[in-house]
Structure formats: structure tokens, C-alpha cells
Amino acid sequence: MKAIRKSVVAATGIALALSLAACGGGGGDAGGDKAAGSSSGKSDNGADKALGAADPAAMLKKAAAKGAEQNTYRMKGVRKDDKGDFTTENAVQVKPDASDGKDVGPKTADTPDGISHVIKVGDKMYLNGEKVPGKKWWTLNLEGAKGRDASEPFVQLTTALATAKDVRNAGVETVGGRRAAHFEGTVVRSELAAYKGDAMKEKDRDDYAKDLKEEGLEKVTIGVWVDKDGVIAKTEESGKGSKGEYHRADEYSDFGADLKIQAPPAAETATEKEVIEYEMKKQK
């Protein structure tokens, strides 16, 4: 029984990692900032001048603090790693814990259509895939599992960039319909692991350094776009390491919105017990 359950858990692959990583479980306050991300995408000489002259350290610190206050948001982007090229989207609610994420990439045995769709509501994780005939979804009970208690990924990237020795203001661009200052720099894993400053929380520092190590990356170029209201509009990270090229870029929206994340219909979802019982029957 334990061996079967272990194989069932392993079969989640990218989907399980997506849901756990994309919802970092940071300490956002309920309600968030409904006005976040409302800056105009039209060029404004006064606003653009202020964004172009913004100090990286000060603006990144402000953006990270504002980001940590957000309880809900959407992210949409692209990712390239050793598993292939993906388009990604995720709706995240920090408290109560919920997320709805989808990866679309290469077709595999676990994802024959190339789609990995994971919904997490509390201690229940729902994954797309017909593990039991006639059921479009199957579920895992995460009760008792140790979740991440670090900040949300976009806050981690922003504070990681703030630790970079070469961080700079690269100019003003339009992202997601809003004008934003583009900050860029190189984060070296060994330097980050030894960082003792106050730009990044110790837990976030350790988690991000671990993430880089798992991706086989010793250094990455990070980009963070921040609008005039101090809201993070986009993050990007790129590098080349032992596993090849890595690139990820995400845009953020709907801060503070009611995302209406819900579990799939019970009639279409196989329970963990049903999945295990079906796997046992197949092995007889």
C-alpha cells in the first residue's frame, strides 16, 4: 500500500512542484490593495522621469513591502528549463491558502496532452488526469505536510535583486498596460547564500539559494519592473547552468481581487483512496 501511494504521489511531477512553489504562503493581509497595478500605460514625461530616476534600492524595498501586503494576485508567463518550454498561469490566494495553476508544455506520460493543471484549496490538492476511469480529476490530501512559509515568489525575486552588487535602473517600459521602471542585476548563488544584509529575509534568502541550486544555476540575471505606485508588474530571471538554459518571465495583475478559486466538482474527482484502490486492481 505504501509503495503504491508513493508512486501515486510521484506521478504528480511538475504539477505538484508548480502548486507548492507558486504559492509561497507569505504573510499577506486579507483584502490586499485593490488599486494595485492601476497605473496608466501611456507615457507621461513627469512620471517617466521619476521612474527613470528612481533609486533601485529604495524602490525595490518599497515594492517588496507592498507585494508582501497582497493577499491575492494572478501571474502569467513563460518558462524554459531542462524539461522544455512552458506557458504558465496561476491565481494565488495567500490566506486562506488556495491556488489554481496551469502549465502547458511538452507531452509526457504523466501529461499526455501537455497540460498540468493543479488546484489547491486548504490541505487538498486536485490534479487533472484520469487516474480512475470516468473522473477528470484526482486529489491528494496534504494534511500534515510542511508547506513553505516564505514570501511569495515575486517578493523573493524583488528582494534577491536588491542584494545584487550590480543592480541598476535600466529605464522605463510599458508592462501589462502600465509604465514601469525596469531594474536589473546579477545574483550569484554563493554570494546570496552568504548575504547578511536587511534587503532580504533569511528564510527567503535560503529558499531562493536552494531553488537556484536545484536548477543547477550558480548565477542568474534578474529583472523586476515596478510601476509608479510601487507595484511589481513583472519579474524575469535567466541563467545557464549544469542543466542548461533557464528562463522565466511572469507578469502580475489582479492584486486584491476576489479570484473565486474553487475545488473541481466532487462528481468529477477521484479521491486518494479510489486512486490507490484502482492502482491495486491494475497490479493484480
Positions of PLM-derived features:
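Subset-of-secretome marker
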Residues: 2-8, 24-284
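C-terminal motif of bacterial Sec signal peptides marking the signal peptidase cleavage site
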Residues: 19-22
